[in-house]
Design a protein with these regions (language model features):
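Bacterial Sec-dependent N-terminal signal peptides
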Residues: 1-23, 237-241
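Short loop/turn motifs that connect adjacent beta-strands in outer-membrane beta-barrel proteins
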Residues: 19-24, 51-52, 98-108, 158-164
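Transmembrane beta-strand segments that form the barrel wall of outer-membrane beta-barrel proteins
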Residues: 21-41, 54-63
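Transmembrane beta-strands of outer-membrane beta-barrel proteins
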Residues: 25-29, 55-59, 89, 107-115, ...
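Extracellular/periplasm-exposed beta-strand and loop segments of Gram-negative cell-envelope proteins
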Residues: 30-32, 64-88, 120-145, 173-228
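Transmembrane beta-strands of outer-membrane beta-barrel pores
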Residues: 31-35, 59-65, 95-97, 115-121, ...
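Structural signature of outer-membrane beta-barrel channels/translocons
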Residues: 46-48, 94-100, 153-157, 238-240
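Outer-membrane beta-barrel "beta-signal"
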Residues: 90, 94, 227-241
Length: 241
C-alpha cells in the first residue's frame, strides 16, 4: 500500500511539473495606459515559442482625457463632450536572457523590439461669442502615435500561474499626428482661439505632450505631424495556462 501511495505521489508530482512545462500561454490585463488615457481597457497574450523566446500582442480601447475649462475667457466656453473613442495595438518579440535567468521563459529578465499604435479622438461642444459670430461650435480632436523601439523588462511568476510583467525601460522612435477639425465656417482668428484652447487641454492632460508636439504649428493650422522620442513603460498582471 505504501509503495502504491509513493508511486501515485510521484505520478501526481510528475504530472504537475509536466503541466507547468506545458504552460506556454499567458493572458494579461494592462494597468499602465490608464495613467495616460481615460477608460483604457487593454488585454494581452504571450506565447512561448522557444525556451528563451516569446511573442506578445496587446489590443484594447482607450480614450483621450476629459477636457475641463478653467479659464475665464468668455469668448470661448466649453459646454461639454459629445463623444470619444480610441484603439490600442502593440506587439513585441522577447528574448529571455538564459545567462541571467534561472528559469526558462516566460520568467526573468528579457529584452526585445516592440511596436505600438495608439489612436484616440474626442468631440466637444462649445459656445463662441465674438463680434462677428455667436453660437455653438463642434470640434473633434484626434491623436495618433506610432512607436517602434527596444524594451527591457522583468517578469515574475508566482504560484506557477500568476504572472507579473514589468516593461521597465522602452526607448523608441515615435511618429505623432494630432489634428483638430471644426464643423463651422469661422475666420482664421476664430479658429486659432479653438486651436489654442485644445492645445492647452492636451498639454495639461497628457504627460510629455509639450516635448514632442510643435505647439506653434498646431495653434496656427490645427494640425501637426512630427517624429520624436518615444517611450514604453508597461505593467501587466497575467494568468498562465
Amino acid at each position: 500500500m505504501r509503495r502504491l501511495f509513493v508511486v501515485l505521489s510521484l505520478f501526481v508530482v510528475a504530472k504537475a511539473f509536466g503541466q507547468e512545462d506545458d504552460r506556454k500561454n499567458t493572458i494579461y490585463l494592462n494597468f499602465t495606459n490608464r495613467v495616460i488615457f481615460n477608460d483604457a481597457f487593454i488585454i494581452g497574450y504571450e506565447r512561448v515559442l522557444k525556451p528563451n523566446r516569446t511573442f506578445t500582442v496587446n489590443i484594447g480601447t482607450i480614450s483621450l482625457p476629459r477636457f475641463t475649462d478653467k479659464s475665464n475667457n468668455d469668448s470661448v466656453q466649453l459646454l461639454g463632450g459629445s463623444g470619444n473613442k480610441g484603439f490600442h495595438f502593440s506587439a513585441d518579440y522577447r528574448f529571455y536572457l538564459s545567462k541571467e535567468n534561472k528559469y526558462e521563459a516566460p520568467r526573468g529578465v528579457y529584452l526585445g523590439p516592440y511596436y505600438a499604435f495608439n489612436y484616440a479622438e474626442r468631440a466637444n461642444q462649445w459656445n463662441l461669442n465674438t463680434s462677428t459670430f455667436t453660437g455653438g461650435v463642434n470640434t473633434k480632436m484626434s491623436l495618433s502615435i506610432h512607436t517602434v523601439g527596444l524594451q527591457f523588462g522583468y517578469q515574475f511568476v508566482v504560484w506557477d500561474r500568476l504572472a507579473l510583467d514589468f516593461a521597465l525601460l522602452g526607448p523608441g522612435l515615435g511618429v505623432y499626428n494630432i489634428k483638430a477639425s471644426i464643423n463651422t465656417n469661422l475666420s482664421e482668428d476664430q479658429k486659432e482661439l479653438f486651436y489654442e484652447k485644445l492645445n492647452s487641454f492636451m498639454a495639461e492632460k497628457i504627460p510629455g505632450y509639450d516635448r514632442v508636439i510643435d505647439e506653434g504649428e498646431f495653434n496656427n493650422k490645427g494640425s501637426t505631424n512630427t517624429t520624436s522620442f518615444g517611450y514604453r513603460y508597461m505593467i501587466n498582471i497575467g494568468y498562465r495556462f
